[in-house]
């Protein structure tokens, strides 16, 4: 009975829910784009990469496949994936420009950054293409995007913890990504409830795991940021006191 009432309420407000989903789709697209420009700003300000090699290269590989090889699978984004691909091409140039500042301890990597980023990007693109051939472009777009999202959420945590510094980190970049992510989750939930799901959602154990993992990771990042920032401030005050003696 309750299920029937819920379904009836959803059908009664189908048009309103569709408008909300469309707004969230546009909001997510804008926030993802601004997120990439925030990466550029942070990299330029701190002179080190603001994102890891795997998240960035996987994003570019996924975008290339679904912008140019299987564009119909990303048609609902109305060209947004192509825009992200072009923006990411600019981002990777900036990232590589400053990446050498992180590899003084490993000259072999430092001398071959363009080659390294190129090989990893091509590798991810081949992987995304192979997966699309295996499961079909529509499902490939969905689960390939899941990998992009997971790396985008996990990468910054690994980066800030390994550096033990907030240099190259940004709460603005995190906030834009979080808004895009949570807005996207709500949008996909509306699609699912109204029977317009572009891929599996609540009926999929893998999707439930993905939703839970992403939420945990995105709530973890600002905690890590503030803990390390407090540590930096404490160290700065300690150094200031020692110098004043």
Swiss-Prot record:
Grouped into one coarse class, the protein's main location is: membrane
* Topology within the bilayer: Multi-pass membrane protein
Question: Cellular component per GO?
Answer: membrane
Cross-referenced Pfam families: Pyr4-TMTC (PF25129)
Q: Does the keyword Ligase apply?
A: no
- Record flagged with keyword Zinc-finger: no
Q: In which pathway does it act?
A: Secondary metabolite biosynthesis; terpenoid biosynthesis
Report, from the record, the phenotype seen after gene disruption.
Answer: Drastically reduces the production of andrastin A.
Glycosylation: residue positions:
164
Query: What are the protein's GO molecular function terms?
Result: lyase activity
Q: Where in the cell is it found?
A: Membrane
- Identify the keywords attached in UniProt to this record, alphabetized: Glycoprotein, Lyase, Membrane, Transmembrane, Transmembrane helix
Q: Which stretches are transmembrane?
A: 20-40, 53-73, 76-96, 112-132, 141-161, 171-191, 209-229
Task: State the EC number(s).
Answer: 4.2.3.-
Gene Ontology biological-process entries: terpenoid biosynthetic process
Q: Which domain of life is it from?
A: Eukaryota
Family affiliation:
Belongs to the paxB family.
User: What is this protein for, i.e. what is its function?
Assistant: Terpene cyclase; part of the gene cluster that mediates the biosynthesis of andrastins, meroterpenoid compounds that exhibit inhibitory activity against ras farnesyltransferase, suggesting that they could be promising leads for antitumor agents. The first step of the pathway is the synthesis of 3,5-dimethylorsellinic acid (DMOA) by the polyketide synthase adrD via condensation of one acetyl-CoA starter unit with 3 malonyl-CoA units and 2 methylations. DMAO is then converted to farnesyl-DMAO by the prenyltransferase adrG.
- List the protein's name: Terpene cyclase adrI
Please name the source species: Penicillium roqueforti
**Gene coding for it:** adrI
């Amino acid at each position: 009975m309750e299920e029937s009432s819920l379904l009836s309420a959803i059908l009664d407000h189908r048009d309103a829910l569709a408008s909300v989903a469309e707004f969230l789709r546009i909001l997510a697209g804008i926030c993802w784009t601004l997120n990439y420009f925030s990466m550029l700003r942070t990299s330029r300000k701190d002179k080190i990469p603001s994102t890891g090699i795997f998240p960035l290269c996987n994003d570019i590989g996924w975008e290339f496949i679904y912008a140019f090889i299987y564009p119909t699978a990303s048609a609902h984004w109305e060209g947004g994936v192509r825009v992200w691909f072009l923006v990411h091409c600019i981002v990777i140039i900036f990232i590589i420009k400053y990446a050498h500042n992180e590899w003084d301890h490993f000259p072999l990597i430092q001398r071959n950054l363009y080659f390294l980023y190129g090989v990893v990007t091509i590798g991810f693109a081949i992987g995304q293409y192979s997966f699309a051939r295996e499961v079909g472009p529509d499902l490939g777009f969905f689960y390939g995007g899941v990998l992009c999202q997971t790396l985008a959420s996990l990468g910054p945590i690994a980066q800030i913890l390994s550096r033990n510094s907030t240099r190259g980190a940004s709460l603005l970049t995190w906030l834009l990504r979080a808004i895009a992510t949570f807005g996207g989750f709500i949008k996909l939930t509306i699609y699912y409830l109204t029977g317009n799901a572009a891929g599996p959602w609540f009926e999929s154990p893998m999707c439930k795991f993905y939703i839970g993992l992403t939420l945990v990771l995105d709530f973890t990042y600002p905690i890590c940021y503030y803990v390390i920032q407090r540590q930096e401030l404490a160290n700065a005050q300690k150094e200031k006191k020692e110098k004043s003696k």
